[in-house]
A protein has these predicted regions:
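Alpha-helical solenoid repeat scaffolds of the TPR/TPR-like class and their adjacent stem/linker regions
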Residues: 152, 159-181
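Long, contiguous interaction/recruitment modules in multidomain scaffold/adaptor proteins
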Residues: 1, 144-162
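Alpha-helical segment of the N-proximal tetratricopeptide repeat
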Residues: 5-17, 177-204, 208
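Alpha-helical tetratricopeptide repeat
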Residues: 4-9, 43-47, 76-80, 114, ...
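Polar helix-capping/helix-linker motif
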Residues: 1-4, 109, 177-180, 188, ...
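Catalytic glycan-binding domains that act on GlcNAc-containing polysaccharides
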Residues: 21-39, 45, 54-57, 61-85, ...
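Residue-level signature for tetratricopeptide repeat
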Residues: 12-13, 48, 52, 85, ...
């Protein structure tokens, strides 16, 4: 019906400009309408509310609108937005409904399997708890990424203290010398060709080895790149092995004495600093972002000026490219924002990427929130993935730095309520 279509469009426009008004009036507007129209109206407002969290903040009425729209087919994007809203507010039955509304491929992703288990165990009955435990066990055995590590924690497993250290054979290293793609990449590197060319050639060589499931060749390439100090490409190759892994290449620890010393001087965990540095620059000291952040810890010039002032130093733009100074400033700044954000490393990690004010704005204002819920509900996808990656990296670095068996949740304390100042 055209009239209903116009109404849905009009309510969508209202929600775009004044979400609170749309949420407050949606039940009054829809009360005498056919059920499918009511669902469409609720879905429209729920979707807009879920995609404008950066502007409007979190609102339980947005989740209610999604709940009221249940029964209509969900697009993959709508289902994910619904799931994250439900996760944010701990509405576990809604989490299950949202995941059930996803495509088969989508719901089989590790993140949604993890949240299906998290939601199922909240039901409390033996069947649901057993189903959740089976999912956790499967995830715990299938990898060592963020959701795999969380799953290990849920069933009481600690991440093993002996990181994989598979070495390439002599034969693998001989084959590396003969591989035309890797030979070109190393030749370009040796003549200091522009990074765009060396990286392109390297990535192509890695892709060919990966498509052949040639872990030995990938490890040989990673070892040689690591020995050359070409850490970002060593990581790129080591990340793509399927059965044979070497985490000293995958989680490189260059400048270890410097990182450990400066981290300890400001009271932060060196494994966390390494986890962040790996995510920021892959240890490319000359890395420069499109917004001007530079160096190993990708420090913005204004941040460097602030840190220099706090440390009683005169700011020098060249400091960003000096390895020692970049690490010293980066660890100081990370410690500084951690102190501003309830001494919580998850909040500080989000703040390092998106700014401390945003990380604080995303804190709950109604009750404390588990760190995995906070992380999954971060409205910026870049920051959401960033926090997951840094926490995962830090867990692996904890092992490599001799900190013993790791529990990722020990790095992710509960997120406190936001203090209104």
């Amino acid at each position: 019906d055209a009239d209903y279509a116009y109404l849905i469009y009009a309510l969508g426009r209202v929600a775009d400009s004044d979400l609170s008004n749309a949420l407050a009036n949606i039940q009054r507007v829809t009360q005498d309408m056919p059920a499918p129209v009511q669902k469409y109206l609720n879905r429209t407002v729920g979707y807009i509310g879920g995609t404008t969290v950066m502007k409007n903040g979190f609102n339980r009425d947005v989740l209610n609108a999604f709940d009221q729209s249940y029964g209509l087919p969900f697009t993959p994007e709508e289902a994910e937005i619904y799931a994250r809203q439900a996760i944010r507010f701990g509405s576990w039955e809604s989490v299950i409904r949202a995941i059930d509304s996803m495509t088969m491929t989508q719901r089989q992703e590790d993140r949604w399997q993890y949240w299906l288990a998290r939601a199922s165990e909240q039901r409390g009955d033996k069947g649901s708890k057993k189903a959740a435990e089976e999912i956790y066990k499967r995830l715990a055995m299938s990898g060592e990424d963020y959701h795999n590590l969380l799953a290990k924690d849920r069933i009481g497993q600690r991440y093993n203290a002996s990181a994989p250290q598979e070495q390439p054979s002599v034969s693998d290293q001989t084959r590396l010398n003969q591989d035309i793609h890797f030979r070109r990449a190393f030749a370009l590197r040796n003549i200091d060709a522009p990074a765009v060319y060396t990286t392109r050639e390297w990535n192509w060589a890695v892709r060919q080895a990966y498509l052949k499931h040639d872990d030995g060749l990938l490890l040989a390439a990673a070892k040689r790149a690591s020995d050359m100090g070409w850490y970002d490409r060593a990581i790129y190759a080591a990340d793509r092995t399927e059965k044979k892994h070497n985490y000293t290449y995958r989680y490189a620890t260059p400048h270890q004495a410097t990182v450990v010393s400066h981290s300890r001087n400001v009271g932060i965990d060196p494994a966390w600093a390494y986890g962040l540095m790996r995510q920021e620059s892959r240890f490319v000291s000359a890395a420069r972002s499109h917004v001007g952040a530079g160096g190993l810890m990708q420090i913005m010039p204004n941040t460097a000026k602030l840190v220099a002032k706090q440390m009683g130093e005169t700011y020098n733009p060249a400091a960003l490219t000096d390895t020692n100074t970049n690490i010293r400033y980066g660890t100081f700044y990370l410690s500084m924002i951690q102190n501003q954000l309830s001494s919580n490393p998850v909040l500080a990690t989000a703040g390092y990427n998106a700014g401390p004010n945003r990380a604080k704005r995303w804190q709950p204002d109604y009750q404390s929130l588990s760190a995995d819920q906070y992380t999954e509900s971060i409205p910026l996808s870049e920051t959401r993935d960033y926090v997951k990656n840094v926490m995962t990296n830090a867990t692996h670095y904890g092992i490599l730095l001799g900190q013993g068996p790791q529990i990722i949740e020990s790095r992710m304390p509960t997120i406190p309520m936001r203090s209104i100042q």
